[in-house]
Amino acid sequence: MRTGVIAKKMGMTRLFQDDGRHVPVTVLSLEGCQVVSVRDKERDGYVAVQLGAGTAKAKNVAKPQRGAYGKAEVEPKAKLVEFRVADDATLDVGAELSADHFVAGQMVDIQGVTQGKGFAGAMKRWGFGGMRATHGVSISHRAHGSTGNRQDPGRVFKNKKMAGHMGARNRTQQNLEIVRTDAERGLLFVKGSVPGSKGGWLLVRDAVKLPRHPEAPYPASIKSAANTNTAPADAPVETPAEEAVVDTAATDGAQES
């Protein structure tokens, strides 16, 4: 079981296929999705990877959390999520995941908070048919009707479908297809719609009810590995021959002096 990723919903568009068909897609953006911490079975009792995405101002982050980010040597994140993984699917702290973590044609599950609709009646919220327009019905055309019996059971059952706040719930949509990926720009193109509003954070995982795509990288596709002391790309690298010439010149100068 691999880790998922944290993505931001950018909006919808369409993509044209080779046969001329156009497919409606939702564009998801991976914005600095990095490993912040790793849970170990010996220390924590389970194996998981903690990912962070986006950026947050340090003054808006709690002091203990700032210490955790400083220990991991990553910038404060706007969204922090933990993914349970297999024992051989852990990642190094500071590693940044790429959009190539998923491949075209792969099925994924996407979790997010649905769009809030405010207080809605039973007809809009639950699809009730409503009552008759005439034949003795007055005032109650869009009412949900009876909510229970009389003395028995003497109460309204839990989860009775009634009017109330609609939307703004954490929901998971399963078996959505990845149409295309753009690793350079960090974009995922998912067929159809996904939960949430524009700018909302989503959790994208491998489909739990289907086998993993054979071409999906395991344990992950890493864009960059942080926390490594590497020389700058523009720094000149001396070859052994050049080093020998420099040492000889220094020795000759010392003998002449």
Swiss-Prot record:
The modification N5-methylglutamine is found at residue 151. The keyword Acetylation does not apply. Keywords: Methylation, Ribonucleoprotein, Ribosomal protein, RNA-binding, rRNA-binding. One of its GO terms (biological process) is translation. Residues 218-257 are annotated as: Disordered. Residues 225-236 have a biased composition (Low complexity). GO terms for cellular component: cytosolic large ribosomal subunit. Methylated by PrmB. Pfam families: Ribosomal_L3. InterPro entries: Ribosomal_uL3, Ribosomal_uL3_bac/org-type, Ribosomal_uL3_CS, Transl_B-barrel_sf. One of its GO terms (molecular function) is structural constituent of ribosome. SUPFAM superfamilies: Translation proteins (SSF50447). One of the primary rRNA binding proteins, it binds directly near the 3'-end of the 23S rRNA, where it nucleates assembly of the 50S subunit. NCBIfam families: L3_bact. PANTHER family: 50S RIBOSOMAL PROTEIN L3, LARGE RIBOSOMAL SUBUNIT PROTEIN UL3C. Belongs to the universal ribosomal protein uL3 family. Part of the 50S ribosomal subunit. Forms a cluster with proteins L14 and L19. This is Large ribosomal subunit protein uL3. It comes from Sphingopyxis alaskensis (strain DSM 13593 / LMG 18877 / RB2256) (Sphingomonas alaskensis). The gene is rplC.
